[in-house]
Amino acid sequence: MVSRVWRPFLFGFFAQGHGEIGVPPYETAVISGIGCSSRLPYYMNTYAMQTIHGRAAAIATGFKVANPDITVWQISGDGDGLAIGGNHFIHALRRNVDLNMILLNNRIYGLTKGQYSPTSERGLVTKSSPYGTVEDPFHPAELAFWRPADVFFARCIAVDGAASVEVLKAAANHKGASVVEVLQNCVIFNDGTHASVATKEGRAKNAIYLEHGKPMLFG
């Protein structure tokens, strides 16, 4: 039985995408930090480590430098990856080591029971912001794009399996650092945070699917 803590992106689409990429398990490592997202290594038949809070990007960088022939996937949540781990995230981009960073963004701290995170929307009422957050959120894409041309960035939503798999495959084929932001719901502490693109109808109105070399289509 799959743990209920596992979200749709984790128990289905990552495994499917990894299988379609075709890299064997003994040439793959999955490295995580701390948080709901960070259970992934336990369910992968690959080299894997769950590391300490905020340090996954640094450890993944070291693993890749020491084992250049291994495909490395690093997975974090928005709190793990952009708060305590924000410095390591930025320097992983600066170094542009060939690793794949997945950032599950539900705009909340879920494992610690509902505090606001670096990506929480201004005004969000949480256990740590009872009168609403007074800070503007980080936008992971803006952090990734400060290093032009070299870094791969893509965003998908966890409930869109087909697009998620294609994004993961594109990230894996990129030589250099890749960042995949996965818009993820937290049904307990921040339900509906990505409601505008959570349904097919919503995505038809509010999402633009971009493919390299193809025109942008609106509506």
Residue ranges and their predicted role:
Residues 3, 21-25, 51, 64-68, ...:
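Solvent-exposed alpha-helices and their adjacent loops that cap or buttress functional pockets
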Residues 16-18, 59-60, 86-87, 165-166:
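A generic local structural motif
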Residues 3-11, 52, 56, 133, ...:
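Generic structural signal for well-ordered, non-membrane alpha-helical segments
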Residues 14, 62, 141-144:
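Structural element of the ATP-grasp superfamily
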Residues 84-98, 104, 108-219:
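Glycine-rich ThDP/TPP pyrophosphate-binding loop and its adjacent helix/strand module
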Residues 31-110:
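Thiamine diphosphate
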Residues 5, 76, 158:
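Conserved residues at beta->alpha junctions
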Residues 1-52:
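Active-site diphosphate/adenylate-binding microenvironment
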